[in-house]
C-alpha cells in the first residue's frame, strides 16, 4: 500500500494525518466522521464554535458540499487549484461539527498530494498548530508543538513559504476579502475579478 492509500485508509477509519499543501501543513480527517473532527479541535485546542475548512479534490466535489452560484463558480473555476480558501454556503451534508454556521470554507490546493488525499471523501484542512501559536513549516517542529497526536505524517520536508491561504467570502452577493494570507502574485488580479461581481 502506498502512502496516499495508507493515509486515506487511516482517515476512513477515524484517524488523523499531518499532510503538506501548497501553503502550510494541515491536519486531515474525514469530514463525515464527527469523532475524528472533534479530535482535530482537541489537537489544536480550538474553540469548537470556530469552523474548520474543507479540502476537496476538484470542483465537482466542491459542489457536493457547497452551493456555488454563477458568479462564485466563475471565480472558483478560474482560481482553483490555488492558495485560496473560498467561503460558500454549505449544504446539509456538511456536519455542524465541521461548521456550526451556514457557511463552509473550501480549498482545492495546487498540490497534487493534498488533492489525492481527498479522492474518496472531503477532508479537513486546518493549519497544523495549536491555536494562537506560530504556524510552523517543518513536520518535526510541528510534532514538537502538537505532540504525538496524529496517526500518520506525510513528510514533504520544509515548506519554504509556509503562509496560510488567502480567504475570500463568496457566500453573499458582495464578495469580501477576509484574510490576505499566502503571498500570491495573483492577489491584485483576483481583487479585480471580485470587484466586477459587486
Predicted regions and their residues:
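Active-site-adjacent structural elements in enzyme catalytic cores
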Residues: 1-198
